[in-house]
């Protein structure tokens, strides 16, 4: 062909991207432009690269990620709303050689499951919690979430979140960073190529720490909900950068993985 005749065949036929093998070839129920699909891919890639395909258990609760088990070909356990950390704790304690993680939204982790979240982290359970923060209840129609920004409009606060009425937005990741059981707490995003690469590094770091028995890890992904926000995917990313990143500042909040856990 044209390229082969010019000695360029190998260059143009080289594979530069492929779908992770753990990603099932099925349509996703997520809205087009949503951040969930990208994060799913990163989780699948990290599990494959670690060679943990047959030794990983994910826990997905109620929320947009309720059907996560359809998309990643690993073992999954469904949990009641907010109870993913409790279920993950049990699985990890029974199977300490397994990589165990939860995949939760802001309503599940920071509202109905805040007790399970904070106590599992404070105990230092050897699990990773992946927290998708899009500041809204996406699955149920766009209601106010614990992480909804001050002034942000939702169907349950149509005039904007007012701290005098609705209280302040909850920064549960920052709160988690002060718990003695947490070893690695970070906030990332997946809105650019660079941020996607950084988020993947964070996921790998947390998973490896859990397998080494180094305590609890929490990875917040500041995400978009273009349907709930009533914006196009492009505009949603712009809004996130202009508003979410000011309140939920990206970066590592805690990293004590190089320190030994005190012996009793």
Pin down the residues of each PLM region.
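Flexible, low-complexity linker and terminal segments
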Residues: 10-16, 20, 25, 211-264
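Glycine-rich beta-alpha junction loops
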Residues: 62-64, 134-136, 192, 221-228
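Short, hinge-like loop/turn segments at secondary-structure boundaries
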Residues: 74-77, 120, 145-149, 235-238
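Active-site-proximal loop->helix
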Residues: 114-119, 139-153
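Active-site diphosphate/adenylate-binding microenvironment
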Residues: 19-80
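Single conserved hydrophobic/aromatic residue that forms the stacking wall/gate
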Residues: 1-12
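Thiamine diphosphate
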Residues: 62-138, 201-205
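Conserved thiamine diphosphate
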Residues: 18, 145-212
């Amino acid at each position: 062909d044209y390229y082969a005749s010019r000695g360029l065949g190998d260059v143009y036929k080289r594979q530069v991207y492929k779908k992770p093998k753990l990603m099932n070839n099925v349509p996703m129920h997520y809205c087009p432009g949503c951040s969930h699909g990208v994060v799913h891919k990163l989780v699948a890639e990290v599990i494959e690269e670690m060679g943990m395909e047959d030794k990983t258990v994910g826990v997905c609760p109620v929320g947009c990620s309720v059907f996560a088990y359809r998309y990643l070909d690993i073992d999954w356990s469904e949990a009641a709303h907010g109870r993913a950390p409790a279920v993950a704790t049990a699985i990890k304690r029974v199977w300490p050689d397994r990589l165990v993680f939860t995949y939760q939204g802001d309503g599940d982790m920071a509202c109905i499951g805040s007790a399970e979240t904070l106590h599992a982290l404070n105990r230092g359970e050897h699990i990773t919690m992946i927290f998708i923060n899009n500041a809204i209840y996406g699955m149920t129609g766009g209601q106010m979430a614990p992480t909804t920004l001050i002034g942000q409009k939702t169907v349950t606060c149509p005039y904007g979140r007012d701290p005098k009425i609705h209280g302040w937005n909850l920064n549960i990741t920052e709160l988690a960073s002060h718990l003695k059981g947490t070893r690695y707490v970070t906030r990332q995003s997946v809105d650019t190529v660079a941020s996607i690469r950084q988020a993947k590094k964070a996921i790998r770091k947390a998973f490896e720490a859990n397998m080494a028995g180094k305590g609890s890890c929490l990875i917040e992904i500041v995400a978009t909900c273009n349907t709930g926000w009533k914006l196009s995917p492009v505009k949603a990313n712009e809004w996130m950068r202009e508003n979410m990143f000011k309140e939920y500042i990206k970066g590592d909040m805690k990293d004590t993985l190089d320190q030994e856990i005190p012996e009793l």
